[in-house]
Amino acid sequence: MQNQRIRIRLKGFDHRLIDQSTAEIVETAKRTGAQVRGPIPLPTRKERFTVLISPHVNKDARDQYELRTHKRLVDIVEPTEKTVDALMRLDLAAGVDVQISLG
């Protein structure tokens, strides 16, 4: 795989799960002899929701909720066949969304 790069983006609501999954990916790639750039923390997306507590009156009574989406980026430069094989067999946490692109 000459002049190839694997870019892995991880998304999730729990930053500890994302950091743990990122560490597994980096350790697997380094063990198989590939160069790793990252993990690079990307900006966290914060969604805020305001909900009225009372169904009829009391407009001032509200609850506010926040949903944070944490993101990480890992680049694997010059991957070997063993690296791709090991990454395909890797079992990550259920709360982490993984997007893989070749470039």
Swiss-Prot record:
GO terms for molecular function: structural constituent of ribosome; tRNA binding. Pfam families: Ribosomal_S10. GO terms for cellular component: ribonucleoprotein complex; ribosome. It comes from the Bacteria. InterPro entries: Ribosomal_uS10, Ribosomal_uS10_CS, Ribosomal_uS10_dom, Ribosomal_uS10_dom_sf. SMART domains: Ribosomal_S10. Keywords: Ribonucleoprotein, Ribosomal protein. GO terms for biological process: translation. PROSITE patterns: RIBOSOMAL_S10. Involved in the binding of tRNA to the ribosomes. Part of the 30S ribosomal subunit. NCBIfam families: PRK00596.1, rpsJ_bact. Belongs to the universal ribosomal protein uS10 family. HAMAP family: Ribosomal_uS10 (MF_00508). This is Small ribosomal subunit protein uS10. The gene is rpsJ.
